[in-house]
């Protein structure tokens, strides 16, 4: 060692056994988390709030999707085509009603012609009447945020403003004068689905990007503040891989605690928001949580680059 000529402050740091690389896995990282309780609480709270925002938006997006197009998704399914009249411009259920000739073509392709109409019940509540052809779903479905009342085709046709669309198998031949839509394109025929989902999904993606930047900034500041301790660890023989493991492990602990708390908060809050169309499920909580964990680790990983390039002598003298 250099105890005979090193400056006193460096000798004191080198004599501090808590900084040696032989104290166990993530010793220094855990010690810093405990020693900086204020900073630890701040970044965990930040992760918690970001997680809550993302999971709440994901749950809201899924809930709005169900109220916008669940009936259409039920009718079309995953391996069938939605058939609408090609009226030019943007195709939707309101503008793409089939003609009688096109409806007969759909039936000739072993397809189903669905009749629908907007109406109101005796209490003045709006609903959409839709022909069920004797096959009603077990749960209440919606279209464009209005509940579906299943009726026979004859009953729906008696209502004013009725329109029709077709459903055929995915291998059916094209029908002249129509457009055939599948998957997300079919759901976009709902007037409310496309606008809601595109805006909400954009917000969620932006939150993922923002979370990576915010967490990266937090960990960058945190990392720069611990450069001297890292330099001493390197000077005492600590390997760069152990330093990397320690830093990533530290970030992982913070992220897991914050993301878990944010996810649990969303699950708890979602149970009380009965008037808001939210679908709190594993798909809307665990998947966003996993993406946030990866985004946070990416931001933390980028912040560790200066640590891996640190010169022990320069860092200790700074």
What are the functions of these language-model segments?
Residues 43-53, 197-217, 254-258, 262, ...:
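Alpha-helical transmembrane segments of integral membrane proteins
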Residues 80-83, 136-192:
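A short beta-strand structural signal in non-transmembrane regions
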Residues 70-128:
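Membrane-proximal extracellular/periplasmic loop immediately following the first transmembrane helix
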Residues 1-41, 303-318:
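Feature of multi-pass inner-membrane transport and sensor proteins
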Residues 252-297, 301-318:
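Short helix-loop junctions at transmembrane helix boundaries
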Residues 39-41, 52-80:
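Alpha-helical transmembrane segments
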Residues 176-213, 220-228, 233, 248, ...:
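Peri-transmembrane interface segments
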